Design a protein with these regions (language model features):
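Beta1/beta-strand and adjacent pyrophosphate-binding region of the FAD-binding site
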Residues: 1-15, 32
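Short loop/edge segments at beta-strand edges and connector loops
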Residues: 35, 120-121, 170-172
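Dinucleotide-binding Rossmann-like beta1-alpha1 core, especially the glycine-rich loop
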Residues: 49-127
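Conserved Rossmann-like nucleotide-cofactor binding loop
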Residues: 15, 39, 206
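Helical element adjacent to the flavin cofactor pocket in flavoenzyme catalytic cores
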Residues: 140-198, 202-209
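Gly/Ala-rich phosphate-binding loop of Rossmann-like dinucleotide-binding domains
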Residues: 20, 24, 160
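Helix-loop-beta segment of a Rossmann-like dinucleotide-binding subdomain
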Residues: 80-91, 105, 118, 125-164, ...
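Glycine-rich FAD pyrophosphate-binding loop
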Residues: 24-45
Length: 211
């Protein structure tokens, strides 16, 4: 196990592996990830993993749009399947407030070059004949909506990060962290300590126990 790195990422779920992957894409090759158990063994394995490109937050919309386009690239880069399934998504509004919200999102979609547009009830019934559209006043259709396999995506990020020089240590719990006077850190594990410039705590609910 390495004893000195630029960055230590704590947590081997989808977020941690994504951070590790993107650090390597930015040229940070001397980076490691520590996972207390197996990759995806925390919250990731049972995530719904729905994918859609729009959110009320503009910044989150940009991230979601970027990520949706990244999955196929990840598969090509790593050979690891992401379980991409995109049958399309319908968004229904039964209130004036929700209709207004959806129309704002449709305007954002045009700005980002995304396919998200209003359809009639007849069109929606053809797309999803088992949905009850009674009382619905506005319907938006996102052809690229769907879901992915969260474990597959996580392992694709991990594979891509490894290809770019990162190292991943499974079954390596973090038992403590200490900051040095110069601002660097010591990450303590059961297998030894790592001296690092930066720590990214991506351990989710278990993060408080990482020091």
């Amino acid at each position: 196990m390495k004893t000195k790195t630029q960055v230590v990422v704590i947590g081997g779920g989808l977020i941690g592996c994504s951070i590790l992957y993107h650090l390597t894409k930015l040229g940070w090759s001397n980076v490691v990830l520590l996972e207390r158990d197996e990759l995806t063994s925390g919250s990731t394995w049972h995530a719904a993993a729905g994918i859609h490109g729009l959110h009320d937050s503009t910044n989150i919309s940009r991230i979601q749009h970027y990520t949706m386009n990244l999955y196929k690239q990840l598969e090509e880069e790593t050979g690891q399947g992401c379980g991409i399934f995109q049958p399309g998504s319908l968004y229904l509004a039964q209130t004036e407030e929700r209709e207004h919200q959806l129309k704002i999102q449709a305007a954002k979609a045009k700005l980002y070059g995304m396919n998200f547009h209003e359809v009639s009830i007849t069109e929606a019934e053809n797309l999803h004949p088992f949905v009850n559209f009674e009382g619905v006043r506005c319907i938006m259709w996102e052809p690229d909506g769907g879901n992915v396999d969260p474990s597959g995506v996580t392992n694709a990020y991990a594979a891509g990060a490894r290809q770019n020089g990162a190292e991943i240590y499974r079954f390596t719990p973090v038992i403590g962290t200490k900051q040095n006077r110069d601002g660097t850190w010591i990450v303590e594990t059961e297998k030894g300590n790592i001296h690092t410039n930066w720590i990214v705590n991506a351990a989710g609910p278990l993060g408080q126990g990482s020091g």
